[in-house]
Amino acid sequence: MNTALLAKQSLIEQNQTLLARFKAKTPIEELVTQRCQFVDSLVKQAWQQHGLDQYPIALIAVGGYGRGELHPHSDVDLLFLFEGELSKAAETTLSEFIAFLWDANLEIGHSVRTLDDTLRLGRDDITIATNLLEARLLTGPETLFDQLYDAIRQSDFWTSSNFFIAKRDEQTARHAKASAFDLEPNIKSCPGGLRDIQTIAWVAMRHFGASRLEELVEYEFLEPAELEELLECQHFLWKLRFALHMAVGRDENRLLFDVQRQVAELMGYEDATQLAVEQMMKRYYRTVRRVMELNEMLLQLFKRATLGHTKALEIQAIDDNYQRRGAFIEALSDDLFDSGEEIVRLFVHIAKNSNIKGIYAPTLRSLRRARRAQLQPLQENPLCRQAFMEILKHPRGIAALSLMHKHGVLSAYLPAWRNIEGQMQFDLFHAYTVDEHTHRLLLNIERFSQPEQKEEFPLGSVLINQLPKKGLLVLGAIFHDIAKGRGGDHSKLGSSDALAFCKLHGLNDHDGRLVAWLVENHLVMSVTAQRRDISDPDVVADFASKVRDAVHLSYLYCLTVADICATNEKTWNNWKGSLLRDLYFSTQRVLARGKEKPVDIRARVREYQAKAKKELLRRGIKEKDLDTLWQRFKADYFLRHQPNQVAWHAEAILKHKQVDEPLVLVSKHTTRGGTELFVYCQDRPKLFATVMAVLDNKNINVHDANIMTSKDNYALDTFVILEQDGEPVSQLSRIQSIRKALEKALASDNPKLPRFRKLSRKMKPFNVPTQVSFLESNRHGTSMMELIALDTPGLLAKVGDIFYRCNTTLLSAKITTIGERAEDFFILQTNDGLQLNETQEHTLKEALISALSAINTESTN
């Protein structure tokens, strides 16, 4: 049998053995060492079998392999070191050896160099230099290896200071490419990942000559507790990487959605109150946060040790206990934080001094020591509460809260915060852990106060400065999601927590109730704006009754916008901004007018018609033609469209000469942050489904639909559409393509609909059970239905087809996509113009669940 195949089989069998030992909870350190030793044996045996031991070539392991750590599918990095020139025979044999290792299914990284070339390249490239630091001789001339070993430890190879600067800059560049809290993190290169631990080890190796992290304790650079924490973090990340390699069967460091469940299972997690995958990711996010803090502190200490005080930092006294050293705050006593009050007082000074951006490393070390020693929550201490309220009331309080969160003091102060640290939700909507999302929400509140944000958040920038007490909004933000992961309604549970906190901290009853109300209702404005018909006066009146007054409305608006923007980078767009602003101003008018005075519907219709007619007459449209056209339209049409929309539609219809052909309009300007699409044609079965199928094929998102029929059975359907990135459809060629595709489909009595797109890789791991619920309708003769389902391609077209088959007419729709979930709201009636009865509701519900659940199952398999 081919020896390469035998080697390949032996590696497969060894991986199976390693996996069995991993499942049996063998320490991961043993497994990565065992893997390395096995590869050592295989490589050295192959070296001898190829007769390479007769040549003066040193076979050297470098990089992670040189460290003696190998995960199941890690790269095997080799340096073939020689002096002078290689003979042709040696070159040929070496090529055959490398090919053998590839055939054996080892991921080989290799270089063939002379000693002089190796040192020259190492001096020019920090990556090569780092790999050489971990060089380990496998076989070959020891004297040649010793020359390399001695040369790379000379100061003229890389000075300790230059090496530190290069590795620090390398890390900064790497961190800029990804967040520690990505949904699909790279566990090796993300901030707080394995590379950050290795960076500490590399800098130590270069500066102290240390070969292991443990030696840093001997050099009194690392405290025993810090070493234990670093090794504990490394242990978990190694286990995670090992399981990831086993799950995907290749060298992979990205923890992608489609393997997270399998990795969690291999790690031994089981579904309980929290999903297994959420438990695993919570541990991961907490681990990387710890690594990030240790990395920051130790590299700051290394900087002092390697660079010294090359540039004197400005020192400014703050009080008897603190001073500012450059951009860092420094405690003047190592035992200052033995008083719990001073742990919080530190951040009061940070809030008060805009020049402070971080904590000086020795002070951070003292803070970490004191934080671990706390036996009860800091909020139990009255002096801590007093200091915390100072932070909350200060204009720069959020900057201080941000650092409190970063360094674990917020969780030491507020026990409930600890519960949400690292808490993720296994979905595509929440891009961050609950604590990181809340942290970003706080930063958004801070952004609203900045003049440069007025263009992006025009209303929020005004309201934030009009709030009676900004600190109450900050408290509402801190508590809005604090009860997530406990089970039950997190809004109500969080509201109770918030009220208790306010009482403990001496807030008056009014302020405490306002904060609790904000927490309990933090989703109400978002849901109303995005999933209800806010052109309906009854919807706005109902929302106004929940809001109570203009002050509550302003607080809720600011919290809602900051919350949406902090959920993920793609959630906020101009369309959502316009919906929330419209709801804000509509509610403001209701509150100013008084909820008891309803809108005069007839007066509004006359007002809108008059404004539209004035503009149309100015454009040369004949009043007689206009009156004739509008007599065909129902009053509801004028209520649901602004005067400029009414004018746009009317002018196009009156100028449309091919009356038997469909009219499709796509606005060249944005309408409330989106692109408006208008379809006018003879109404017919499956019209909505046809339009949805075409738009899906064009990769267009539909966010709003108003489905209307004239008295003489013409469709007057309006849609708000956006590109996949949330931006309006603006390219002229794109607009023309959409219009032509719709005209072609609508011109046929039996159109051939395009095939739906395939489900994306990210969507496949998710299974959203289809839910259909009917709500109490406040509009005569209509039914209101909510649909929750997996957001599969062509979903709305399929829903429209089911409406047709169930003899149901769609009047309007609000389309909301929350990650992998579609949460859509429809206003329906029977084909006879009546409200659906219980039997009809049941039939429609069963048809939707049956059809969409089948699609859900097909898509995720």
Swiss-Prot record:
Give the Enzyme Commission number. 2.7.7.59, 3.1.4.-
Q: What are the entry keywords?
A: Hydrolase, Magnesium, Multifunctional enzyme, Nucleotidyltransferase, Repeat, Transferase
**The protein's required cofactors:** Mg(2+)
Q: Per its record, how is this protein called by name?
A: Bifunctional uridylyltransferase/uridylyl-removing enzyme
Task: Output the Gene Ontology terms for molecular function.
Answer: [protein-PII] uridylyltransferase activity; phosphoric diester hydrolase activity
Task: Give the catalysed reaction(s), semicolon-separated.
Answer: [protein-PII]-L-tyrosine + UTP = [protein-PII]-uridylyl-L-tyrosine + diphosphate; [protein-PII]-uridylyl-L-tyrosine + H2O = [protein-PII]-L-tyrosine + UMP + H(+)
Describe activation and inhibition of this protein.
Uridylyltransferase (UTase) activity is inhibited by glutamine, while glutamine activates uridylyl-removing (UR) activity.
